[in-house]
């Protein structure tokens, strides 16, 4: 992770575990880094409130402070209005009739990358980074590697500019994501992720677990908890 690439990167940064590990990974590898968040009326919007504190904390890690540039926030209220999902409505978190969980927001990652590329076009950022993962994911079709590859080609063609859509976590599971955090920033980064990132779909930060805050029963909490347990077992 010591190699630094002289390219500006723009990170999709939600304030969650995965996007925070991605941001740390990018800060370790690129000279200039900016972040972008999206407010689409998500039920777990509490994660957006974590972003500023996380960004500030990451600047204190050796060599990262000078690299982290401006943060951007894009409002996408219409996405929330047209989406009948557990993240945008009072809908039970369960498996839907279409074989996808009700937490799937159709088009979300497609829009995120497209808006980020449009911003990157103006900001001179040719690398757009997201925390999508198809190893531990919930079956979301917009988290698959082939989806991201197709979208990258479409964005490059549609904007007539070379962009790279980078997904550092695509092939690793949640335990390996915790391990990557430790590799990048040691116990300090792992502790930061536990205390300040948010994953819970219900937006619950009233309960503190070994792995962080959350309801403990939604799919996001269960995945994070299992990954943390496996990570600790791997260290033993």
From Swiss-Prot:
Keyword terms of this UniProt record: ATP-binding, Ligase, Metal-binding, Nucleotide-binding, Queuosine biosynthesis, Zinc
Binding site for Zn(2+): 200, 215, 218, 221
Cofactor: Zn(2+)
Binding, ATP: 13-23
EC category name: ligase
EC number: 6.3.4.20
Parts of the chain that traverse the membrane: none
GO molecular function terms attached to this record: ATP binding; ligase activity, forming carbon-nitrogen bonds; zinc ion binding
Gene3D superfamilies (alphabetical): HUPs
Biological process per Gene Ontology, one example term: queuosine biosynthetic process
Matches recorded under Pfam families: QueC
Keyword Lipoprotein annotated: no
Reaction it catalyzes: 7-carboxy-7-deazaguanine + NH4(+) + ATP = 7-cyano-7-deazaguanine + ADP + phosphate + H2O + H(+)
Bound cofactor: record note: Binds 1 zinc ion per subunit.
SUPFAM superfamilies: Adenine nucleotide alpha hydrolases-like (SSF52402)
Keyword field contains Zinc: yes
Superkingdom assignment: Bacteria
Pathway annotation from the record: Purine metabolism; 7-cyano-7-deazaguanine biosynthesis
Family from the record: Belongs to the QueC family.
Function: Catalyzes the ATP-dependent conversion of 7-carboxy-7-deazaguanine (CDG) to 7-cyano-7-deazaguanine (preQ(0)).
Protein's UniProt name: 7-cyano-7-deazaguanine synthase
Name of the coding gene: queC
